[in-house]
Amino acid sequence: MIDPWDVEEVDYERLTEEFGIRPIDEKVRELLPRRFPLLDRGIVFGHRDYDSFLKDYNDGKLVSVLSGMMPSGRMHLGHKTVVDQLVFYQQEMDVKVYVPIADLEAHHARNMDLDRAHRIAVEEYVLNYAALGLDLDPDRCEIYLQSERKTVQRMALLLAGRLTWNTVKNTYGFTGETNMGHAFAPIVQAADILHPQEIEGPHRVLVPVGVDQDPHLRLTRDIAEKEDLIKPASTYHRFMTGLTGGKMSSSKPNTAIFLTDDPETAKEKVWNAKTGGGATLEEHREHGGNPDECVVYELMVYHLADRIGGDEKLREIRKKCREGDIICGECKRMVGEALAEILEELERRREDVRDELPDLLSQHPDAPEVPEDW
């Protein structure tokens, strides 16, 4: 069983075999209108009906993309992986994007005050989404709060009749101690995913998520079949490893590079990050390192390849690491400098969009308001 609210390490191969997640192979990638590095590098590794989504798109049929945000903490590079996908589909394929803000889920599952959740959603997430390149024009993107979108609330109440307590309990491991708001959260998520069909008519919705969210997709696909709706497609990306190992997490600051970290803080975190190098310099030179266990190399693959010379440079660094011809300090300096550049640029873009955000969000009737002390 996968717990969407508490996951540390994932056996991707087991999940693929046990739950029927299909690998994204070259045949699927060829359906894209252009190459997408997150797929080519194996970061987005699996799917359900992604090929059907792409075929519908190529046939000129209506499609949309939806992926939500949980406003319970600071936004980090792991979250950026989702935004990069949304930006690709919107900017490169001109597909409309839906961004639900899971404020009700944050309230019930994380004990987050709603007003606090709304502030975090605006200051940490919506602002960074826009700075990372997502166009907030309401014709191209809909941002909304679960607590405000009546279509989602009505649909959730109706869909609840399609599920038994045993189904939900067995899917998520809920117990007699689980509050009913938390237990109802998966049904609200199903309504999030299916409601674009209520608004725009039957069509395939793609949901790009981390693999921990697959229980929601399996449940939603079962409900869609019962409701004679088109089953959502989904893609699954690998989690970024935390700087100290395990999963990168907002609740563990030393594991994450936050998008609002200043450049020097980011460099220091990288310098202290876990690597795949030898125990000593001599051992590393003699036996080489293991880039597959190196957080610093992973940062290059996920976010920095274009900054350091592309895939060819990645292959060169990987080879040199294995042969002991490049040491960890060199990689850390390279990654630290590249990250500093990204964070500086992101801060400038946040400032550029900050003054426009109140007007942009006012065009989304179910979105949170910008705080008065903005």
Swiss-Prot record:
In chain numbering, where does the motif 'HIGH' region fall? 71-79
Q: What class of enzyme is it?
A: ligase
Quickly give the catalysed reaction: tRNA(Trp) + L-tryptophan + ATP = L-tryptophyl-tRNA(Trp) + AMP + diphosphate + H(+)
Q: What is its main location?
A: cytoplasm
Q: What are the disulphide bonds in this sequence? A: none
Residue span of motif 'KMSKS' region: 247-251
Q: Which domain of life is it from?
A: Archaea
- One Gene Ontology molecular-function label: ATP binding
Location relative to the cell: Cytoplasm
| GO CC terms, sorted | cytoplasm
Instruction: Give UniProt keywords alphabetically.
Output: Aminoacyl-tRNA synthetase, ATP-binding, Cytoplasm, Ligase, Nucleotide-binding, Protein biosynthesis
| Pfam families per UniProt | tRNA-synt_1b
Q: What is its EC number?
A: 6.1.1.2
| GO annotation terms (biological process) | tryptophanyl-tRNA aminoacylation
Q: Which CDD domains match?
A: TrpRS_core
Q: Which InterPro entries match?
A: aa-tRNA-synth_Ic (IPR002305), Rossmann-like_a/b/a_fold (IPR014729), Trp-tRNA-ligase (IPR002306), Tryptophan-tRNA-ligase_arc (IPR020653)
Sorted alphabetically, which Gene3D superfamilies does this protein's record hold? HUPs (3.40.50.620), Tyrosyl-Transfer RNA Synthetase (1.10.240.10)
Which HAMAP family does this UniProt record tie to the protein? Trp_tRNA_synth_A
Q: Which family does it belong to?
A: Belongs to the class-I aminoacyl-tRNA synthetase family.
Name of the protein described by the UniProt record: Tryptophan--tRNA ligase
Q: Which gene encodes it?
A: trpS
